[in-house]
Amino acid sequence: MQRPPIDEFALKETSPKIVGAGAITGDKLTSTYDLVEQMQYLYVRVVKAKELPGKDVTGSCDPYVEVKLGNYKGVTRHFEKKTNPEWNHVFAFSQDRLQASFVEVLVKDKDFIVDDFIGRIQFDLSEVPRRVPPDSPLAPQWYRLEDKKGDKIKTGEIMLAIWKGTQADEAFPDAWHSDAATVGREGVTNIRGKVYLSPKLWYFRVNVIECQDLLPGEKNRIPDVAVRVAVGNQAMRTKVAKGVNPMWNEDFVFVTAEPFEDPLVIFVEDRVGSNTEVLGKCVIMLSNVPRRFDHKPLPAKWHNLEKHTLVEGEKKETRFASKIHLRIYLEGGYHVLDESTHYSSDLRPTSRQLWKSSIGLLELGIISAMGLSPMKTRDGLGTTDAYCVAKYGPKWVRTRSIVGSTSPKWNEQYTWEVFDPHTVVTVGVFDNGHIHGGGKDSVIGKVRIRLSTLETDRVYTHSYPLIILQTSGVKKTGEVQLAVRFSCTSFFNMLHKYTQPLLPKMHYAHPLSITQLDMLRHHANLLVAMRLGRAEPPLKKEVVDYMLDVGIHIWSVRKSKANFYRIMNCLSGLIAVGKWFEQICHWKNPITTILIHVLHVILMIYPELILPTIFLYLFLIGIWRWRWKPRHPPHMDIHLSHAHAVGGDELDEEFDTFPTSKGSDLVRMRYDRLRSIAGRIQTVVGDLATQGERFHSLISWRDPRASALFVTFCLIMAFVLYVTPFQVLGLLAGFYVLRHPRFRHKLPSLPVNFFRRLPARTDCLL
């Protein structure tokens, strides 16, 4: 596979014309949108009409409004048999593409063949007023309609407002845009920008303690009882216990979301051979469940079990009922993990009572994209209907879709409160597949920015490469231009955050296991995708899954190689120090070795200088490297991800489904390759275990002669270290390590020889 050029995937600093970055514009009217370029629009708000003349035999009409500006035309919906219609519709025409000097508003009557003309009104664009927030909205006015000759008609007026503004206008999000003139009225909803909120997620704990007075179907048989606990599509089961008064005391944790839709359903089941008999059932509404905010236990309650469903809270008289002892509560002290822990955008607990005050503000300007790959074919040409999705905390934002452009300009700005700097904002770019049909939204790429890597109150304007990994290899699908500013409201609180635990206290007081967290994260992803998919326009499941990095933990050869090289890169400093020290010991540079001898003597004479010297050295290194500190935020690195040199078969394996959908021969080949890799890892792990077992065998007397020698050596060293000053021992040890090569030999040292002869448990392995 041919390797891509390095510059193609590099981060580029840009200089957009934005107020926040100090750009100078000739327009004195500015807005709060200071991280994006101003886009000029002509707005036409069509409110209503009255006393329209009839055009059919009944004296009525089916009116609608058509707004024409050059080659662009926007149309409202029509009303049947109504002479006083109300539309309240806003049209936004981009002034970058205007090729006309006036705008025409026509009122027409909907007909089967040719629509009839009712009246019109024209406006000279040079006379249209300008309005930018925080100015109050422009009040609409009544205008008498004119005929085609320009004369006033007898009856018929239209109320509308027309003004020039920017994308900061309140009418912008819900307006019809000239950029989407080819989109039908039904598809306009799917291209509008929206703000979404993730559902409030809770961990829900059920402690199944015991049952009492169970009534099995066969009275002479001791039942094998298990309890099945279900919430929505989540279900867990206790172990089997015998008897009519069984006890379990098992904990189960589920994920649920407000508003609570699914009840908690408890089934007590008796296993009779291969069949299961339900001995009792209880339904509990989650809205009635208490909430816990700390580690203090809540009291347990007895609940009646019925053969038929009994909703908790409803009054129903029963003479006798089996009971189940449960401790149920919603956990408000945990943070429900719905993202990968490496890219979390929110670390607060579920309960708002436990939230701390915010430390700052994150402002994101989504300016434009360049060179996007065509994702579909329309009229024989490749095109893209791109939109962006940004997620930080529970707030998701979606820009409007720019139809038919590989270089779209959004210029939309959004703001989030920041509660922890160790969080990540994620921006994804997608192709809208729902404009002309029900296809899926295609992924173009995404960008992650960690807030702790940003300087406060500085505006970062960069063009980020959009990179995706396909079965054919790594591919750049374009670039997205962003402006980011992290403002700090309390510098002390922000620094204090660095001393606090990453997650809420409950994660450490009562930690959940790794297996539980993985399972709960999976169900949390499903809940978030389901709730956001109900919005209008919906945020599709494929978009939510991509933003939440669903499936990121699935194994692949590429990821394993990337992590291995990351470890080697982290250890490269220690390896370099080791090589440098080896050169010192072998007198490769005599002057440096002599200086190390002098330093060693000073530190041994004054041992109290050792720790201050180490910290002073680290301080000087940090100050020295400040001059070369990173000036740009981090971005996707194909070399760090090992995506530039990955083979085709490894990529095909990475994109395989789980469980696999490949043929048996291919799976056998990959299995053999995995066995080969695992064999090498197994050898390394075995060698480490051997060294550890040799260390333990020093005093285990497995080798009696070796243990006797070691014990005798320890006794001698105890006396030597007791009577010899520490400085003398340190000097002698240092001089021995730094001795001249003429006093060295290539054979292993005595301690190494002794250690390698110690027994390990390899002899006991099959």
Regions found by a protein language model. Give the residues of each.
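Calcium-regulated, polybasic anionic-phospholipid
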Residues: Y41-T83, V208-P246, I366-T406, G433
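Hydrophobic lipid-interacting interfaces of membrane-associated proteins
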Residues: A49-K50, I209-L214, I367-L372, T489, ...
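Multipass alpha-helical transmembrane domains of eukaryotic endomembrane proteins
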Residues: I554-P590, P630-A718, H740-L766
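Transmembrane alpha-helices of multi-pass eukaryotic membrane proteins
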Residues: H89, E250-V253, E412-Q413, N589-L618, ...
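Extended cytosolic scaffolds built from alpha-helical repeats
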Residues: Y508-R627, M636-I638, F713
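Intrinsically disordered, low-complexity PEST-like regions enriched in Ser/Thr and acidic residues
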Residues: R3-L42, A175-Y203, E339-L361
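Short Pro-Gly-centered beta-turn/loop motif in secreted/extracellular proteins
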Residues: A92-A100, V253-D262, T415-T423
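C2 and C2-like phospholipid-binding beta-sandwich domains
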Residues: M1-K17, T30-T32, V47, Y64, ...
